[in-house]
Amino acid sequence: MSQSKDLQGGKAFGLLKAQQEERLDGINKHFLDDPKYSSDEDLQSKLEAFKTKYMEFDLNGNGDIDIMSLKRMLEKLGVPKTHLELKKLIREVSSGSEETFSYSDFLRMMLGKRSAILRMILMYEEKNKEHQKPTGPPAKKAISELP
């Protein structure tokens, strides 16, 4: 088996993610230098947050999020969509292919006017993190607190 096809975990996966992060940082720099987005407040931190989310769902590191990665992301957020809805969403976002969208497409959507869908996705994910189950024994309740 060739080394380039061996994507097992560990060192090879770490190198793949490091290369992916370098590519995405280059795209972020392009967006930071673009005068169209210079008026956005706190653009640097937004781009870092978007990069982290994109890397989380681009598991194979090829630079594109496909329909199954998008499906997994929405299911994780508790907003499952049908295959046709996912295709429509990708078609709206993508500048080229109908089956995938790139990091540049993702950023244009997030920073542009048509960002409501993905902002909603990120908002649900943040709310999901806030409601973590408490650890330890449950708190004692008085009789008046019982239903």
Swiss-Prot record:
Region feature Disordered, mapped onto this chain: 127-147
Residue positions where N-acetylserine is found in the record: 2
Predominant location category: cytoplasm
Binding-site residues, Ca(2+) 2: 98, 100, 105
InterPro entries: AIF-1_EF_pair (IPR049025), AIF1/AIF1L (IPR042433), EF-hand-dom_pair (IPR011992), EF_hand_dom (IPR002048)
Residue numbers of N6-acetyllysine PTMs: 11
GO biological process: actin crosslink formation; actin filament bundle assembly; actin filament polymerization; cellular response to hormone stimulus; cellular response to hydroperoxide; cellular response to lipopolysaccharide; cellular response to morphine; cellular response to oxidative stress
Compartmental location: Cytoplasm, Cytoskeleton; Cell projection, Ruffle membrane; Cell projection, Phagocytic cup
Gene3D superfamilies: EF-hand
One GO CC term, this protein: cytosol
Record flagged with keyword Oxidoreductase: no
Binding site for Ca(2+) 1: 58, 60, 62, 64
Keywords for this protein: Acetylation, Actin-binding, Calcium, Cell membrane, Cell projection, Cytoplasm, Cytoskeleton, Membrane, Metal-binding, Phosphoprotein, Repeat
Record GO terms (molecular function): actin filament binding; calcium ion binding
PTM annotation (Phosphoserine): residues: 39
Membrane topology: Peripheral membrane protein
Tissue-by-tissue expression: Cardiac allograft, spleen and testis. Expressed by inflammatory cells (macrophages and neutrophils).
Domain (EF-hand): residue spans on this chain: 45-80, 81-115
Keyword Calcium assigned: yes
Induction and repression of expression: By interferon gamma.
Quaternary assembly: Homodimer (Potential). Monomer. Interacts with LCP1.
Described purpose of this protein according to its UniProt entry: Actin-binding protein that enhances membrane ruffling and RAC activation. Enhances the actin-bundling activity of LCP1. Binds calcium. Plays a role in RAC signaling and in phagocytosis. May play an role in macrophage activation and function. Promotes the proliferation of vascular smooth muscle cells and of T-lymphocytes. Enhances lymphocyte migration. Plays a role in vascular inflammation.
Official protein name in the record: Allograft inflammatory factor 1
Biological source species: Rattus norvegicus (Rat)
The encoding gene: Aif1
